[in-house]
Amino acid sequence: MSKTTRKTTDMGWPDLDALWMYNVLPEPFLSSELSRLSLANSIGDTDVVTFQPCPNPDVSNEDRFIVKDWSLPNGTWSFRAIFDGRRSRVLDLPFQLNQLLGHAGHETVDYVASNLPNTIQNALAKVVHHNNAPDASTISNVLTSTIASFDEDIGKALLTLFPDPEALAKLSDKEIRDIINDGANSTTILRCMLGSTVLISLVNPSRTSLWIASLGDCAAGMTKCSMGD
């Protein structure tokens, strides 16, 4: 077995007064492990990797990626997205969510990955149905408004559980606890307590225009491949 060196890091958070252990792997073992953990794959013309080397299942990978080619009336649109689940550092609740115990924070990112792409596709389909060649600003508005509306709907779902503040004030602690821990209700609450970044790229059928939508601490980079590289 290859010899490894163990070191510590503060992960860039010196104020937390905590250190994490990690192993410095030599080559070729480093490349071998990176290849094994990255789950490298190709989907059509898109190459993807995703990895979280931490072995603790409670902090398993919260990244999700979506690769879709949408056949719409004016041609095929290329949709690519990355969603990264986010956890609040402080979850200060007067009532403990049963589902939160041992929770890794996947509810929101799973919901976003499963539903936001289809929501954007439907909104885009309506636009190109009426205008076969929408201008760039129209597509930008579709992305912006759809993402904003989707985010608002997550919050509205929570408010439907307690629509009347006066009625809520009259509920006992047990009654509130029973509501928030009632099956789907706890998932609705967790989606608001947790979160997800959004990074989307969209290319039109003629491949002449590219749109990028970014929400949260994520960024997209663009490069150009030379012939033979």
Label each PLM-derived region with a short phrase:
Residues M1-D229:
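PP2C/PPM-type serine/threonine phosphatase catalytic domain
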